[in-house]
């Protein structure tokens, strides 16, 4: 009976780890999540990883494309910071030290480190085709940083590692050798599937937020649809996303179409340029991005 009580209490304690940390609110969506790592910790790790990556990466030698990445990135960053300051997230602005780099890599990819360190691969540009397409991608990557998805996932990983380790040890001691190993594997699978779902949710949330950020910066959010269609056509597969950490292209496009009416409420066209040039395509007066959190359509 004593062993059984220890077992039950320990299992409860292990799964309670998932609720540790401080509750924080994601800008724009209003979603709350629990974070157990500090901004200082995540920024330190991020800066180390970014410095290591850039030390070996080859920066693009295309001056026009590099200037475009920096121009679009800075415009998005300004719009995002303005929104954060006007909507109660002033404290988060200090975490960003924006950098925008274009590197020589044929992969169609981009990423944004916590703290605003952004890298775009040259292989992505044929898909973005213009500044607006690039803004859709950068808005998405910036959204990951603003929503603190890295800290959220790190929190989950810490809880998983601690929880499965404790559970396996206690079960081996209270029930018998070997049982704890099986239980740890089962618990790890539970956490893995849960984290997998949350990761896909993070991607969907970043799509939504990125769409809004692009609109705030004066880029037409409707161009997200043809961009993802191009990405879908260039993808080697478009299989079901049930075991993927990213939504399928089909699901992603459908979700973006559903959110488009909300994004258009933020959209006011501004000056844009053709790819690799300084030729203006449209100009209007910049507007405020002061908007309260909007409940997302289901």
Put a short name on every predicted segment.
Residues 2-7, 20-298:
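A Zn2+-metalloprotease active-site environment signal
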């Amino acid at each position: 009976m004593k062993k059984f009580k220890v077992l039950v209490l320990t299992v409860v304690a292990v799964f309670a780890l998932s609720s540790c940390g401080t509750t924080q609110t994601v800008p724009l969506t209003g979603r709350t999540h629990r974070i157990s790592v500090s901004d200082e910790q995540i920024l330190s790790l991020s800066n180390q990883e970014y410095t290591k990556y850039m030390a070996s990466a080859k920066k693009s030698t295309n001056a026009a494309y590099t200037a475009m990445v920096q121009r679009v990135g800075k415009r998005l960053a300004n719009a995002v910071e303005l929104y954060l300051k006007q909507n109660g997230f002033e404290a988060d602005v200090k975490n960003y030290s924006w950098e925008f780099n274009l590197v020589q890599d044929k992969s169609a990819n981009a990423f944004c480190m916590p703290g605003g360190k952004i890298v775009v691969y040259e292989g992505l540009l044929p898909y973005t085709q213009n500044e607006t397409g690039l803004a859709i991608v950068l808005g998405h990557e910036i959204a990951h940083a603003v929503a603190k998805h890295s800290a959220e996932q790190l929190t989950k990983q810490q809880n998983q590692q601690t929880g499965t380790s404790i559970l396996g040890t206690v079960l081996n001691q209270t029930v018998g050798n070997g049982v704890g190993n099986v239980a740890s594997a089962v618990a790890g699978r539970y956490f893995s599937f849960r984290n997998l779902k949350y990761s896909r949710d993070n991607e969907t949330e970043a799509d939504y937020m990125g769409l809004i950020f692009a609109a705030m910066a004066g880029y037409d959010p409707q161009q997200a649809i043809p961009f993802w269609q191009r990405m879908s056509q260039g993808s080697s597969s478009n299989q079901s996303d049930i075991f993927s950490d990213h939504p399928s292209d089909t699901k992603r496009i459908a979700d973006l179409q559903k959110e488009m009416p909300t994004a258009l409420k933020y959209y006011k066209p501004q000056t844009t340029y053709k790819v690799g040039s300084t030729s203006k395509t449209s100009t209007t007066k910049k507007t405020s991005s002061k908007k309260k959190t909007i409940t997302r359509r289901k």
